Amino acid sequence: MNFENNSTIAAIATAYGVGSIAIVRISGPKSLSIAQKLSKKKDIQPRVAHLVTLYDDQSEPIDQAILIYFQAPKSFTGEDVVEFQCHGGVVVANMILQELLKAGARLANPGEFSKRAFFNGKIDLSEAEAIAKMIEAKSEDAAKILAKQIKGELKNYIENLREKLIRILAYVEVNIDYAEEDLPKDLQEQIEQQLNDIQEELQKIVASSKRRAGLIEGFKVAIIGKPNTGKSSLLNALLDYERAIVSDIAGTTRDTIEESVRIGTHLVRFVDTAGIREAHDTIEKIGIERSIQAIEESDIVIAMFDASKPLDAEDKKILELIESYKDQKEFIVVANKVDKGKHLDLSDFDALYMSVKKEITPLTQKLQKLLDSFANTEEIMLVTSRQIEAVTYALENINQARTPLQMGELEIFAFHINRVIESIGSITRPMQSSELLDKMFGEFCLGK
């Protein structure tokens, strides 16, 4: 694969800032000759750590560094790659990078090293996406899931699934060639059962992946309730500082407030919503609409009630919301302000009776237990919306293939199964345009 006339690319691979070591990386046909020029060392052996002095174009020393040469195709990109491990900080790494550019390399685009690895067959697209997500991993569980995907777990699963589908297609196409004969009944039933199994498996993977998406991106927890139930007090207690305004005036929080906290090993974004009540103020009404949106976008919802007062119409609206979303969302019901009295019974909702201004440990413990239940690192997981969309499209075509199979319209059935195969295959090696790939790899950081 040619990349801009076999160009050699260069970038700083480590994060910008102060550190003990920085890594500058080059990849392409000129990598070795450029390394020889900067180090004034001709005998550079592959996969050997060479201690060298690097020089600028005026033969002035820049730094003493470790130079490692990875000869093609045994490198991350599949090309000749050289890494310079120099002293950390911004200045030295930038000086080395500038000399590499003077010597014939060009500055790499974001994600270009991974893009070259993809086009050279060193990684597939699911592995490339996992690399990008690993850099931004928010938890240990995320790192474990992504490490498996980088190792090829999803790729292997997809290949096995494609083989099953291709086998089904082969059975059908043999019968298409003999159009005068119907598909044998036992074979049709066998194919239907195989499709049922594949469909059920894919549906579980999509549902599980959506449910566990917070492991990768961080979980979102919405705090809802009518005004003055203690939502802002809870957020402040979780943060251990006063982020939200606490007031006895209803409607003080008129917009959603988001803050991130670690609960156990999980990164959690708490959303303190506007109180859900009959709104007479346009601004407050917008806040309430955003509260409902926050519920729909959240993984977990904490519903707050004032235990010191009987349920009123506004509380009942919250209970109606819980009933509406209980099959889609996880809820934790909190009866707050028990220090002022206990005048409502929420035992049907397994409520926590507490005063969030005094003690939130029971709530954080229940929340952590719930978050831990998401953390199944053993199951296959789709880690990007692109992967989920590909499987969803495949499921649509499996459904569309059923009637043609039952009606004996085998060519139409084969058309839909081909769509399924293409869609599933696109997870690892898409057939789309280079423009899409440019966009995807462009979201990587420099040096990857």
Curated annotation (Swiss-Prot):
Membrane is among the record's keywords: no
Binding site residues for GTP: 228-233, 247-253, 272-275
Sites where the protein binds Mg(2+): 232, 253
UniProt xrefs under Pfam families: MMR_HSR1, MnmE_helical, TrmE_N
Localization, UniProt: Cytoplasm
Record flagged with keyword Nucleotide-binding: yes
Primary localization: cytoplasm
Enzyme Commission number(s) of this protein: 3.6.-.-
Residue positions binding (6S)-5-formyl-5,6,7,8-tetrahydrofolate: 25, 83, 122, 448
Gene Ontology MF: a single term: metal ion binding
Domain of life of the organism encoding this protein: Bacteria
Cofactor note: Binds 1 potassium ion per subunit.
Cofactors that this protein relies on: K(+)
Boundaries of every TrmE-type G domain copy: 218-372
Residues that coordinate or bind K(+): 228, 247, 249, 252
GO biological process, any: tRNA methylation
Family annotation (InterPro entries): G_TrmE, GTP-bd, GTP-bd_TrmE_N, GTPase_MnmE, MnmE_dom2, MnmE_helical, P-loop_NTPase, Small_GTP-bd
Entry function: Exhibits a very high intrinsic GTPase hydrolysis rate. Involved in the addition of a carboxymethylaminomethyl (cmnm) group at the wobble position (U34) of certain tRNAs, forming tRNA-cmnm(5)s(2)U34.
Quaternary context: Homodimer. Heterotetramer of two MnmE and two MnmG subunits.
Family: Belongs to the TRAFAC class TrmE-Era-EngA-EngB-Septin-like GTPase superfamily. TrmE GTPase family.
NCBIfam families in UniProt: mnmE_trmE_thdF (TIGR00450), PRK05291.1-3 (NF003661), small_GTP (TIGR00231)
Protein name in the entry: tRNA modification GTPase MnmE
